[in-house]
Amino acid sequence: SWLALMVPYSFLFFLIDSLVLWRVVNWYNAEVRYVDILPIRGSSYILSILNEQVGKGAMALYLNRRNGVPGWEVGSSMLFIMFCEFYYLLTWASVGYALQGDSLPDVFSVIPKVAVGAALVFIVFRLFFRGTLFPNSTVRDKPVFHAFRQARTWHFGMIILLRSPALLSAVWVYTVALSYFGVEVGNMQMLGYLPIIFFGAATPGPMRTVAITLWVVLFPGYEGQMTAFGFVQHNFFIFFNAAIGLVFLNRANRELFGQSEQQSGSEA
């Protein structure tokens, strides 16, 4: 059934999302066990209902207090994850456009240009943080850029690879889920559409406006089914992830605020 499809997918996304956080923190901040990342990554989904960046801020605070990682440095790791997430979404959106660009609204024709521009920005970005470009600049030495100074070029690609199973599994899940709403679509067709929708919805501007309603545009004649599909898929994913967070909330609070109280007591 639909729930039997969505529940395992949500857990898989949570585990992959936690893996990315664990990998980045261990690269740039401190040695942390994967199982110790799960409580804060899960709990942060509750705050992400309001705003994704608030959730990342909570993770930064947790790692700062629990592992003693300097605030600016762990904040830098959160920025690194956000930076890689943009390139991850853009990479797969480019694949999607290559597969189904002819059937997409004209607003998405900008994706190849965005991809080329982003590639050039990445090259300049890497040259700057390696000290090749503007070698006398002190901007790169600021704590907020700690992760970017430490990063190797392959780290960026590794994060994209680690995240990709989440998107590929989403393609299959959405393909099957759509059939429950009476609409049949192939996996390759969904691979063309879904990354575009994810990228567009995460990007401010005209693409976001169109992406939110793209299901209806892509499947004319099924307006009611597609409106329901987009609404149900999006909201189930957000709220079930928050429910996962509730499982870990007590432990996260205990490790975060309990440790803070112990520190206050020792200072007194």
Predicted regions and their residues:
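Membrane-interface alpha-helices at helix entry/exit sites of multi-pass transporters
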Residues: 34-37, 56-57, 68-83, 222-232
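Helix-terminus/helix-capping segments at the ends of transmembrane helices and short amphipathic helices
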Residues: 25, 63-64, 178, 216
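Predominantly cytoplasmic-facing regulatory/coupling regions of multi-pass membrane proteins
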Residues: 1-42, 98-202, 221-268
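Membrane-embedded alpha-helical segments of transport systems
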Residues: 43-51, 73-97, 231-243
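Transmembrane helix boundary and interhelical junction motifs in multipass membrane proteins
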Residues: 15-20, 50-60, 188-189, 198-215
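Short gly/ser-rich anion-binding loops that grip negatively charged ligand groups
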Residues: 14, 28, 32, 36, ...
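Extended non-transmembrane interhelical loops and adjacent amphipathic helices
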Residues: 38-68
